[in-house]
Regions:
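A glycine/serine/threonine-rich, flexible loop-to-helix segment
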Residues: 106, 157-165, 243
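C-terminal substrate-binding subdomain of Rossmann-fold SDR/epimerase-dehydratase oxidoreductases
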Residues: 19-20, 27, 168-307
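N-terminal Rossmann-like NAD(P)+-binding domain of SDR-like oxidoreductases, especially those catalyzing
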Residues: 1-150, 293, 300
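A short, amphipathic alpha-helix embedded in the catalytic core of nucleotide-handling enzymes
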Residues: 77, 134, 160-168, 199-203
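Short beta-loop-alpha junction of Rossmann-like oxidoreductase domains
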Residues: 101-103, 153-155, 159, 275
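The catalytic Tyr-centered alpha-helix of NAD(P)H-dependent dehydrogenases
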Residues: 116-123, 153, 157-161, 189-193
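Hydrophobic alpha-helix immediately C-terminal to the catalytic Tyr-X-X-X-Lys motif of short-chain
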Residues: 126, 130, 134, 164, ...
Length: 307
């Protein structure tokens, strides 16, 4: 779902020492791997499969592209990974949306039933099932993560937080998706990209201990799953007000009935993060500090709001 300019921009901010640790290999993941790709990549121990098309609106207007990007590409990567003799862990990066809308006070656990309500979440669920099948069929070591609404610096301006930053800066009205009566805003557990990275590193570094600790939790089911959850649940109106406050403006907004304006969208998603907390991980920085961090960076790097 990203822009390759993000990688080059981040590399420009890296030290020469860190740059030497990074190599970019270009390949269309919808195409099967070839000998040249294998030679370029060389030996590897870990794969974090985070590549995906992720915008719900686009998945509704163009579902087949999402099938190619999120299902076919995942199958190709798994096929490539299973040939490695050095693979220690494959992490498939999934989404809270595979569970569908969450009623009030319901927080979905890792092994709860799936209920995809749009093509994006359906293709991510399909990728998950492929990961489970590959672990069962080929004894590949695989973890699956679910995250909720990742945000951060350089986020695509089509997403809610960059839109709010632009609207607050320019004194424009923000659309807040709500229930049919326009009295209650949708809510999420927003999580910063740095916290997601921290959670993934925690899983990688502690993978052997984790497998032993949870092996009896789900009756020995393959592919352990982990919810990486943000610090607090936050409705979108409160989030927009936090952003406007950080920008230094008063929020202008209107509540919009999301049912009629955005088919395939859900008012509330919610994940139970108790498993990761029990294992010893939770986000280290408050949502307020993360919002300030992103707003300040974005206003200083305005070109990212135009990409």
């Amino acid at each position: 779902s990203g822009n390759l300019n993000r990688i080059s921009d981040m590399m420009n901010e890296m030290s020469e020492k860190d740059k030497r640790r990074l190599r970019v290999v270009h390949h269309d993941l919808r195409a099967e791997e070839n000998d040249m790709l294998a030679a370029d990549l060389g030996k590897f121990n870990f794969i974090l499969h985070m590549a995906a098309s992720s915008h719900v609106d686009r998945s509704i207007t163009d579902p087949l592209t999402f099938v190619y990007d999120n299902v076919v590409a995942t199958c190709n990567i798994l096929n490539f990974a299973k040939k490695s003799k050095n693979l220690e862990l494959f992490v498939y990066f999934s989404t809270d949306e595979v569970f569908g809308p969450a009623p009030n006070k319901v927080m979905y656990k890792e092994r709860d039933r799936y209920n995809s309500t749009n093509p994006y979440s359906a293709t991510k669920a399909g990728g998950e099932e492929l990961a489970v099948a590959f672990e069962n069929s080929y004894q590949m070591p695989i973890f699956i993560t679910h995250t909720m609404n990742v945000f951060g610096e350089r986020q695509h301006p089509e997403k809610f937080i960059p839109k709010c930053i632009i609207s607050a800066r320019d004194n424009l009205s923000v659309e807040i998706h709500s229930n049919r009566n326009k009295t209650k805003a949708g809510s999420r557990h927003y999580i910063h990209a740095c916290d997601v990275a921290d959670g993934c590193l925690f899983l990688i570094k502690n993978r052997n201990k984790i497998v032993k600790k949870i092996k009896n939790d789900y009756g020995g089911a393959k592919c352990p799953k982990f919810n990486l959850v943000g610090p607090v649940e936050l409705d979108n109106l409160k989030l927009a007000k936090l952003i406007a406050k950080s920008v230094g403006k008063k929020l202008r907004y209107k509540m919009v009935d999301f049912h009629s304006s955005r088919p395939g969208h859900d008012l509330r998603y919610a994940l139970d993060g108790s498993l990761m907390k029990r294992l010893g991980w939770k986000p280290k920085v408050s949502i307020e500090k993360r919002i300030d961090q992103v707003v300040n960076w974005t206003l200083k790097n305005k070109r990212w709001l135009k990409i």
